[in-house]
C-alpha cells in the first residue's frame, strides 16, 4: 500500500475510510486490530512511514472510537467468551493504545516536516520559473552610415576566401596547422554614437 507524499491530514482522512459494522462480533474486531497493528509494524520496518501512519491511525480510531461503543462491551457478562473478549479489549486500550498514539504522534511530526519541506521546495522552484524573463529580442537600430549591400558583399567575400583557403589546403595536402594563412574579415560599420570614440 503506497500512499505517496501527502500531508498528515490527508493521510488521516484516508485512515478513516473503512467500513465498521456494529453487529460484527467483538472477537472478530479484536483479530482485525491485531492484523492492522501487524501490518502497520511491517510497513514501518520497510520504511514506508506514510502507510504505517495510516494503519496505526486506523487502529487507534477503531479501538478508541468505534469499539468503545460496541454492544458486547455494554452487556452484562453472560458467557465466559464475552468476558474474555471484553478483558482483551480493555488490555488493548490500557497497554497498546497509548504506545500506538505516541507512534502516531511521532510519525505525524516527521510526515508534516517532510511535507512542509517539499512544499517549500516546490514553491521555490515555481517562483524561480516565474522569475525567468521572457527574452524578447528588440529590433537593433543600425547607424545611418550602415550600408547593407556593402556589408553583404564583405560577408560574401569572407566566405569565399575561407572556402578557397580550405580548398587550397586540401589540394596541396597541406593540413599543417603551422601554415599561416591570412584571413580577411568583413568591414564592420562605424558607430557614430559610440561612447568610447
From Swiss-Prot:
Q: Tell me which UniProt keywords the record has, alphabetically.
A: Endosome, Protease inhibitor, Thiol protease inhibitor
Any GO BP annotation: ubiquitin recycling
- Any one cellular-component term (Gene Ontology): endosome
Location comes to: Endosome
Source organism superkingdom? Eukaryota
* One Gene Ontology MF term: cysteine-type endopeptidase inhibitor activity
> What Pfam families does this protein map onto?
USP8_dimer
- Just give the chief location class: other
**Family (UniProt):** Belongs to the RFU1 family.
- Sum up the protein's function in the record's words: Inhibitor of the DOA4 deubiquitinase involved in the regulation of protein degradation by the proteasome and maintenance of a normal level of free ubiquitin.
Q: Indicate what this protein is called per its UniProt record.
A: Regulator of free ubiquitin chains 1
Q: Which organism is it from?
A: Vanderwaltozyma polyspora (strain ATCC 22028 / DSM 70294 / BCRC 21397 / CBS 2163 / NBRC 10782 / NRRL Y-8283 / UCD 57-17)
